[in-house]
A protein has these predicted regions:
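Short, gly/Ser/Thr-rich active-site loops of penicillin-recognizing serine hydrolases
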Residues: 137-171
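Short amphipathic alpha-helical coupling segments at ligand-binding clamshell hinges
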Residues: 39-42, 91, 136-143
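Flexible loop/turn segments at secondary-structure boundaries
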Residues: 70-73, 115-117, 134-135
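Short, surface-exposed loop/helix-turn segments at secondary-structure junctions
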Residues: 38, 57, 71-93
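Small-aliphatic-rich amphipathic alpha-helix that forms the alpha element of a beta-alpha
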Residues: 85-110
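Conserved C-terminal structural/oligomerization subdomain of aldehyde/semialdehyde dehydrogenase
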Residues: 76, 87, 122-129, 133
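Short helix-loop capping/hinge segments that flank enzyme active sites or metal/cofactor-binding pockets
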Residues: 1-51, 60, 65, 108-124
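Short, glycine/charged-enriched secondary-structure capping and boundary segments
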Residues: 76-79, 105, 114
Length: 171
């Protein structure tokens, strides 16, 4: 609700947005002031609690699954037409909402592949860090990916492209 309301108030025109995004922003426009203020109080309380935890445990990363479910197969028209599955979207945000709501930096890494549909679907871990501590998160993510893609673990899909390597000119 908070993000939708903030997005709506910062958007001068809805032209250029998809129909689904326009609907979400319209929902944000209908948020009662009372609910918005209660959400801000909740955010402040959560941020104070997290700040206390980091004061007690400097450098702590909060690690959770990225989502409570593995990725799902891409359907025939999904890439062309998109997908609108609100239940799955909400379910996949089970663990990421705290970082989103409190503005904490977070990074997700792949840690495995499970059977799903015609192939394999990714599963991941997410780490959330203290505000301003992005370097530690990036190091955790780099080490985690090196481990995940290490010898005998996960294999990259045939269509995988190393975009960072391409950008650096390493590929």
């Amino acid at each position: 609700m908070t993000i939708l309301t903030e997005m709506f108030t910062a958007t001068p025109s809805l032209s250029g947005f998809s129909a689904a995004t326009k609907i979400l922003l319209a929902v944000g426009a209908q948020t009662p002031t009372r609910d918005f203020l209660l959400a801000q109080k909740t955010r402040e309380m959560l941020m104070q609690h997290l700040a206390h935890l980091w004061q007690m445990h400097p450098g702590m990363l909060i690690v959770t699954p990225t989502t409570p479910n593995a990725g799902w197969p891409i359907g025939g028209g999904d890439l062309k037409n998109g997908v609108s599955d609100a239940n799955t979207s909400v379910r996949t945000m089970t663990f990421v909402w705290l970082a989103n709501f409190t503005g904490c930096p977070a990074v997700s890494i792949p840690v495995g592949l499970v059977k799903g549909g015609d192939g394999k679907a990714p599963v991941g871990l997410m780490a959330m860090g203290e505000w301003g501590d992005e370097e530690e998160l990036m190091e955790w993510g780099r080490e985690g990916e090196e481990w995940a893609w290490g010898e005998g673990r996960m294999e990259r899909p045939e269509n995988w492209v190393d975009v960072l390597g391409l950008a650096k000119g390493d590929v």
